[in-house]
């Protein structure tokens, strides 16, 4: 009886401890603050998975507690001998089917969300996506706008409400491009182009970062994503085209060398003299000097 009372006293303290723990969270986690359709779909998947697993954990602990209390050894059943059994068909079917059902319940929405993230969000299929090439290097990010014929370093401007088709690649070690409030991460790799679709629902500033350790300058691989209204975005593009310097090959070679740089803006892009689909893009300087 005393054991039972002690257990329920400890159990009653659990909600209070959780409240105290959550009280230390003074702002929203970026992953749990979706600001676009891709991030919202992934957020819904996280919530569904969390609720399902929480339900499973709760059922397991309740059953464990009930069995522990109900069937514990007592003075009146010291001589109890359990019946000899060689199996229970019903129980074996249940504990085989339950895990299968759990896996199916998790797999179906996960597969649907994963495949949906590989194309333009369904809410914006009628809108032409803006194409941006993302190149990771040690230790900076290069963003090339082929249609606008401009390029930025360590910051990114996009139109709000318009899907963005990112073309991810690398001129250094493998990295991971991640804007938590807009969607999940995807790797950037030498000699490969990976597509990633993201979209910001409204104007705002969102932090992007590297999610894959790439050496001593890894902590500096953060960038700002600013979503602008269509009018402000078009105005920014025109200003860059008219006022920013050209990105020459020499300047590009200097930028991609290992090191930390600040924000840069150019009125041309390196895609005009480097083909990201070719093997040479893996290590542009190496192949250029080899020739």
Curated annotation (Swiss-Prot):
Transmembrane segments: 49-69, 91-111
InterPro entries hit by this protein: CcO_II, CcO_II-like_C, Cupredoxin, CuRO_UO_II, Cyt_c_oxidase_su2_TM_dom, Cyt_c_oxidase_su2_TM_sf, Cyt_o_ubiquinol_oxidase_su2, QoxA
Coiled coil: none
GO cellular component terms attached to this protein's record: plasma membrane
Main location: membrane
Top-level taxon in the UniProt lineage: Bacteria
Subcellular location: Cell membrane
Gene Ontology annotations of biological process type: ATP synthesis coupled electron transport
GO MF annotation list: copper ion binding; cytochrome bo3 ubiquinol oxidase activity; cytochrome-c oxidase activity; oxidoreductase activity, acting on diphenols and related substances as donors, oxygen as acceptor
Enzyme class: oxidoreductase
Keyword annotations of the record: Cell membrane, Electron transport, Membrane, Oxidoreductase, Respiratory chain, Signal, Transmembrane, Transmembrane helix, Transport
Catalysed reactions, semicolon-separated: 2 a quinol + O2 = 2 a quinone + 2 H2O
Membrane topology note: Multi-pass membrane protein
Signal peptide (residue range): 1-28
EC number(s) on file: 1.10.3.-
A Pfam cross-reference name: COX2_TM
Family, per entry: Belongs to the cytochrome c oxidase subunit 2 family.
Function: Catalyzes quinol oxidation with the concomitant reduction of oxygen to water. Subunit II transfers the electrons from a quinol to the binuclear center of the catalytic subunit I.
Protein name per UniProt: Quinol oxidase subunit 2
Organism: Bacillus anthracis
